[in-house]
Regions:
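Conserved structural position within tetratricopeptide repeats
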Residues: 11-14, 44-48, 82
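TPR/TPR-like (Sel1-like) alpha-helical repeat modules
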Residues: 70-89, 101
Length: 101
């Protein structure tokens, strides 16, 4: 079932490669199906193309953590905190705890 949704998002993205809503939807499907490498690649493209307010960075950091790339996870968390602050989201200002990484 998830693979059908992934294929649908990929088809939509192929006809509109800059559609950040579709990119984020594809990333969520990769996250649900545990495809961390694809998730990381898609989120990095999404972050470059969008004005994300911080949520994608948390997803990205979690994916990096799952594959053991702690330095990249820490950097993604930090970028997420900085981005959330720029957008005025105080709930996202928390620095990751030591155990988070």
């Amino acid at each position: 079932m998830a693979s059908n949704r992934i294929e649908l998002f990929k088809q939509m993205l192929s006809s509109d490669p800059g559609n950040t809503t579709v990119m984020f939807g594809l990333a969520k499907e990769y996250e649900k199906s545990g495809q961390d490498s694809e998730l990381i690649e898609t989120l990095n493209r999404y972050i470059e193309a969008s004005d994300d307010e911080g949520n994608a960075f948390g997803m990205l950091a979690s994916a990096y953590e799952r594959i053991g790339q702690r330095d990249q996870a820490k950097a993604a968390y930090q970028r997420g905190v900085e981005t959330a602050q720029r957008h005025g989201h105080p709930g996202h200002r928390r620095q990751p705890r030591q155990g988070d990484l």
